[in-house]
Amino acid sequence: MTEVLVTASFPADLMARISAVSHSLEVAQLDLSRRDWPEGRATTAEILYSYGAGKLPPLDLAPNLRWVQFHTAGINRLRESEIWHSDILLTSASGIHAPNMGQYVMAQILAWANRTPTWFYYQQRGEWPAGRWDKFLPDELRGRTLGILGYGSIGREVARLAKAFGLTVLASKRDARDVKDHGYMVPGAGDPKGVTADRIYPGAAAR
C-alpha cells in the first residue's frame, strides 16, 4: 500500500473519491488549512497533498516522502528550501485555474462595456436618471484591442475567449520566440500552440 496524506480541508465525499482512485492507496487526512505543520509531527506518507510551503514536514520527519502535490499554482518561494534541493518530486496546480479566471476576466470586461455597475447603482437607489441613454449605452467590444501582460495559462484562456467577442489580442511573454505553452492546460482551454493572439511581444517591449 502507498500512503497518501492530504493536508487540505477536503470534505468527506471528496476524500472518498481520492481513496477510490486506487485500491493500492491508503489515504489519510491532516487538516492544516488554518495552521502549519505541527512541530515534531512525523509522517510515514510517501505522497503528500499540501496547501503550501508552510504545510510541509521537515524532511527528517518524513523519511518515506517521494512526491508532494501542491494545492496552489505557484511554488517559487520554495526555491531556497531543503525540499526543493532534494530528490522529492514537486508538482503544482498551475494551469487548472485558467477556465475560471478567464471567465472572471471576461465578466469584468463585459460589465465595464455594458455599464453594469451604473445599472446597479441606479437600481439600488430606485432611480430612473435623466440622460439615461448616455449613461446606459453599452460599448461594443468588437474591433477593440485587449493587451495581456504575461501569456501563461490564464492569459491564453482570456485570449481565446476575447477572440470570440471580436477583440484584437496583443500579448507579451518573457520569451516571445517560444510561443507554445509547455505547462498543463485544461483540455479545450487556452492557446497551447500560441496561435490565438494577433501578436506576441517580448516582455521588455511592455515596459
Predicted feature residues:
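N-terminal glycine-/charge-rich "phosphate-binding" loop or analogous flexible N-terminal tail
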Residues: 1-47, 177-182, 186
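Short beta->alpha connector loops
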Residues: 9-12, 31-34, 50-56, 71-75, ...
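Rossmann-fold NAD(P)-dependent oxidoreductase module
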Residues: 17, 104, 108, 157, ...
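Short, conserved catalytic or adaptor-binding loops enriched in Gly and charged residues
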Residues: 18-21, 81-85, 188-195
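Short gly/ser/thr-rich secondary-structure transition/capping motifs
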Residues: 25-34, 47-52, 125-132, 183-184, ...
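Short amphipathic alpha-helix with an adjacent loop that forms part of the alpha/beta core around
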Residues: 37-41, 59-61, 205-207
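Phosphate/diphosphate ligand-binding glycine-rich loop within oxidoreductases
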Residues: 44-124, 138-142
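Rossmann-like dinucleotide/phosphate-binding beta-alpha-beta segment
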Residues: 134-207
